[in-house]
UniProtKB/Swiss-Prot annotation:
InterPro entries: DUF167 (IPR003746), YggU-like_sf (IPR036591)
Coiled-coil region: none
Pfam families, sorted: DUF167
Family annotation (Gene3D superfamilies): YggU-like
Signal sequence extent: none
Stored HAMAP family: UPF0235 (MF_00634)
Protein name (record): UPF0235 protein Cvib_0403
Annotated family: Belongs to the UPF0235 family.
SUPFAM superfamilies (alphabetical): YggU-like
Superkingdom of source: Bacteria
Any one Gene Ontology cellular component term annotated for this protein: cytoplasm
Amino acid sequence: MRVVAVREKKGNALFSVRVQPRASKTAVSGPYAGGLKITLKAAPVDDAANRECCRLFAGMFGIADGRVHVVSGRSSRSKSVMLEGVSSREAEEAFERFGL
């Protein structure tokens, strides 16, 4: 059963993220409205929370930070994240391995 809705655009996986900045730890909290809810230690100042969001998913997928992009919602808690060079199928399989 797929909880995270992953789309694909030009060979890159896209999915929705709801962010809670200034949390006690950086982690994936679980599913949220077809996407994921994450907590970030970083404050939403000077793009720090967006950079930490990218680092979190880069670590999960074993890819370079520069291959993870916040493509919409840079100044919002609701964001769209793109994994460059990762297909939607690969992303879905990874989320399933993580129990998401």
